[in-house]
Amino acid sequence: MERIQSDTMKLGDRIKAYEHQFTDYKIDPSLPFIARVDGKAFHTYTKRMHKPFDYRFIKAMQETAKKLTETFDPILTYVQSDEITLLFKPTTEAFLSGKLSKMNSVIASTATYWFSKFIDPETPTVGLPLFDCRVFNVPDEWEAINALRFRYRDAVRNAVSSAARYKVGHKKCDGLNTDEKLKIIGSDWKGYLMEARYGTFYHRVNVEKPVDIDRSKLKPEVAAKIPETCIRTEIQEYYVKLATSWSNSLPYQLDPIYMPLNSPAAGIDDIKNATDVIFRGEDAVLYANGEETTET
């Protein structure tokens, strides 16, 4: 790195020029992009918490993920352990002008603030809860889904390892794969909550709500102008509607089937048209038994 000659630029402009060399990098808003929020040294921060899963910690992470979804408006948020992944669809201009330095710092500081608010003060911790963030583009929708699949699989693998180590100790788990560890855990595995085993997906949805107002205190002509309901946005756990084309041959109408996206039966790893489901809200088509998940 070379020094800018002082006789060609004022001091303030010169210092800003150094700064801009490192802070002007931007994501491409025309492509999907992901923000991965990660707890800094949380192995130490959580070492005194209940094992294998401390539900006070899980709840605080879930609430933090919901606040990040509310604040930054990704199309999908996935939280597992001390990680939160935010998926953003292509747009004309990303928030904070797409500047990576600002996006990383603002998302990380927002996560740190809200987690500190949500964590139960009685939870035994070591050190401070700090988060970092890495924002990056992916080339297309399919790779965006694969990024989520990777995080989902990593979450399950780590959860299985935690439960197995808790049951028999670290040494007996050395060299074992996930299936072998699941055999060690046995029926105890299903006794843990879904969010501990598979993480949780969230998104923003529009919900019709009744207008909460005492119309008896209003003049009739005023009350008549106020609608009975209004549309509000809420952050909810992500459920997918399963495609049931086979039901068209039945002589009766079936109710729609909805499954949480973290379900081991109809989760993100099981959805054949995951890009259409996540990016366009279509009904989910599951892989057939024995059909391999396609990755390209």
Give names to the regions the model predicted.
Residues 1-296:
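Regulatory and interdomain segments flanking nucleotide-handling catalytic cores
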